[in-house]
Amino acid sequence: SSEEVPEIPEMLENVLLFALDEAKEKMEEGAELVPFTTLVVKENLFIESHPGDSSEECYNLAQHTVEGARGADAYAFCYDGYVETDDGTKDVIIAEGGVPGAKDGYAVGYLYTVDDEGGYTFEEEAAYIGEAPNFMAKLKSGVDYGEDEIDEKYLTEVDEDPSTGIDTDGE
């Protein structure tokens, strides 16, 4: 689309793309994609699934998790969805996210097709979808919270995944 792609903060862009790649991998392995959030807290990445009976319930669970994530610097909320295009409705894995205190968040995604055998073909490049709600709009920057204000689950030491340099604890 002709929509102008904004400058997305680098950390946020990395988290959004990480979430999309995680989702893509799950789907290629034939697993169901349960909506999940990834949160960056002090160099660590926390992944939490948000299974629900409806997309609305998943959304509310994700929003609740992120709004309570004091000390986090960015998040992504990733789910399987669709977008309306000039060529009709397209399947897309969507990651939307934001950073503390910003009015708006951003949504990016991988468009994909499914063949008759159930095999997925994903677009090479993530596409910018548009602005999204920012669940972190009311949070302060991560460094503005003292250790005592940050949920303990985000302060534990975690194992770093050497291949990405991104911590993968909290799956």
What spans do the regions from the language model cover?
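N-terminal domain-onset segments
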Residues: 1-65
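Solvent-exposed loop and beta-edge segments used for protein-protein assembly and interaction
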Residues: 30-32, 71, 87-89
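A charged amphipathic helix-loop-strand protein-protein interaction module that recurs
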Residues: 55-85
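Low-complexity intrinsically disordered segments
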Residues: 74-171
